Amino acid sequence: MNLNNMNNELNFVYKENKCCLACGCNNLKIILDLGDQPLANNYHNNEKQEKYPLKLNLCNVCYHLQLSHIVNPDLMFKHYLYVSGTSQTLKDYFDFFSKKTLEYTPNARTVLDIACNDGTQLDSYKILGLETYGIDPAKNLYKDSVNKGHNIICDYFNESTIYNFSNKKFDIITAQNVLAHTEYAKNFLESCKLIMKEDSILFVQTSQSNMIENNEFDTIYHEHVSFFNTNSMKNLVERSGLVLNDVFKTDIHGGSYVFVITKKQLKLESNNVLEQLQIEKQNGLYDVTTYLNYALKCYNSAISLKTQIQELKNKDYIMIGYGAAAKGNTLLNFSNIFLDKIIDDNPLKQNLFTPGMNIPIVNSDILLTINVNHKIAFIPLAWNFYKEIKERIKKKRNNNNDLFVKYFPTINIER
């Protein structure tokens, strides 16, 4: 797409997506309708929230899942309250990820992290001796990265902004949970290609790899316009003139793909791409019936969770969410669940309200003010950090009557 046309198309609030973002066809089918919802990261001071359609389309050709409507990215990313550095689990993962990528290219000297957030991933690369660069449109996070000594551009990543790096080409390019945020996925990869050397490697990470298997619907919100499988990624990569050389899965964010992309075929010992394609086919990911069943399970899951939480309220449990995560807002809004409070360790979210359900967000110190004998049922909304959340709560409050409610893949209550 011509960049001027792309910029002109940004003058909208939201629009319908009529073509597959991976393979380009127009054979799309609505699979799941989560209703009209507010922007999942639009935490506010008890203000009225605009709502937008939140529906999931399936491509009948490459089986790429994608939103039926796309919201203007400026409404979501210019002021961003999700911060990577507040989770120790994520910091540990970034250390693993940086070392893992260097196994593919041990002589790398430069790295570009697209959508670098507060620079936490770049911190890991800097410790390993690499020259670190990043790009991110969030103006409120820009100084955090710069103050750590990283070279940062505050903007969206595209074929125009890459020239702010003075025609530099990078040994490693990382794009974690960002390709799924853009409707211009092909342009994104083509722009990456322009700043890759012949032996550079692009690592694209996408979450939701277990989304269908575990009946997860909370990761569907307006920021996530795409939900990749290996087949749809392979289609997109090849349309962009690149090669999908490898793929591996990690446990982060409840299960993620990491796609290893290059300008030419590398001599790798693994047959992971072929194997993953076969696994996905065996699991029914290339069959529309699987997705229709998934939608039905999502509706039933929402009803069951609402019923379970109401039963706990009837037993005089205080209902507290932990982690004011975007995914939690999809869950709460779709299920129409109200909690007493939500705890979050990110100061940028504290003393605000969640979008849609308008639940107050508080500091974890509130646990010290609640009578230790009063029963609390905790709902870890950032369930991808469940173990870390449970440990944090236990350190501040030790009550054997407290409950922890897990809801994917099925509802499970623990002490």
Role assignments for model-derived ranges:
Residues 3-89, 248:
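N-terminal juxtadomain amphipathic helix
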Residues 174:
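A conserved beta-strand element that flanks and buttresses the S-adenosyl-L-methionine
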Residues 186-201:
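A short glycine-rich, Lys/Arg-flanked "PGG" loop and its adjoining helix->strand segment in the class I
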